[in-house]
Amino acid sequence: MKKLIAITIAAMTIACGGTGTSGGGSPKMDVSIGGKASTLAIKSSGSNKSVKTFTDASGKMTTATSFHATMANYDLDTTNMSTMRKPLTAPEQVRVTLQLIGAEGTDQNAELKPGVYKADAKEKFMKVDALSIATFADGKETNTNFETTFSGSKITGQIEVTSVTADAISGKIDVTDGDKSVKGTFTANIAKKP
């Protein structure tokens, strides 16, 4: 019998000591997988910024900022994206990763802007490009991915980035893909430039 897997995200510690949310309160996400839902507190987060290149049918190339954020209810090794994805080791551990694509013509040096990023596989820019939840059960890690790239995807919703500071990005998420959903607020630490 499958074990109940349910996740949600709450309270994160920001490097500057604040919650990063407007109107008070701690950020949290209600996560549902297979109709089973719960709420979890986030203990740590990290991020990475890069560039995504697109080439259209005529050969024209354009770029956009690609922002990855990883949030977990355990201490992440935030050295880089690979270390943030080290395998989970305990049943209570949960990791949520998202990727946002910015405006057309931006690059890895551009800051992600506040705004709406649609969960629509047909969009190229200002979109949710990836969303996944890692859980641990029966002695192994399971990754549940939302279908964000297949043109026939049933994914709906959006991530609204409401605040970007030197230390953190905050926003609201409401994304559904079949029997999976993530809804609520979030804050993710922004990686410091060397």
Predicted regions and their residues:
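Sec-dependent signal peptide recognition
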Residues: 2-8
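A generic structural signal for short, solvent-exposed coil/turn residues
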Residues: 8, 23, 34, 88-90, ...
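C-terminal motif of bacterial Sec signal peptides marking the signal peptidase cleavage site
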Residues: 13-15
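An ectodomain-focused feature that recognizes extracytoplasmic/extracellular
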Residues: 19-149
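Acidic, glycine-rich flexible loop segments
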Residues: 112-193
